[in-house]
A protein has these predicted regions:
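Short, low-complexity, polar/charged sequence segments that are solvent-exposed and flexible
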Residues: 31-33, 83, 117-118
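Non-catalytic architectural context of zinc metalloproteases
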Residues: 11-13, 63
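Short active-site segment of divalent metal-dependent hydrolases/proteases
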Residues: 67-75
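Catalytic zinc-binding patch centered on the HExxH motif and its immediate surroundings
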Residues: 1-4, 15-52
Length: 118
């Protein structure tokens, strides 16, 4: 699948945990490779210790990971990925901020939709 991020096509790939060493090496369930225009996320049903999770929990976690990585891609394509540096690092790659946008984005979108603000 591809997704358009501000005019740049990113390939979105879902991989099994065992198919991508980055999951184990970095303790992550997704990542965005800006240079390659790739977003990769883990099939959470293959993630260690997730075998007892419900299909709904797996699905919701995978959606959250995709939203998170897409936010990273938007920041990068906006020129904000590493150009907003501070002493402690760029605000645009701050995981807490990216998580907030990824978690609250659907709610913000729904509020905009209800207000006919789209």
């Amino acid at each position: 699948m591809t997704v358009n991020i501000l005019g740049t096509k990113y390939t979105v790939t879902k991989k099994k945990y065992s198919e991508d060493p980055a999951f184990a090496k970095s303790g992550i369930d997704g990542y965005c490779k800006f240079q390659l225009h790739q977003i990769v996320h883990c099939d959470m049903s293959t993630y260690p210790d997730w075998e007892d999770e419900s299909p709904e929990s797996i699905h919701n976690t995978e959606q959250q990971t995709l939203r998170h990585e897409i936010v990273h891609a938007f920041f990068h394509e906006s020129g904000l990925s590493y150009n907003a540096n501070t002493v402690d690092g760029s605000w645009a790659v701050n995981e807490e901020m990216v998580d907030w946008i990824a978690l609250q984005g659907p709610k913000v979108y729904e509020a905009w939709r209800q207000a006919d603000a789209l």
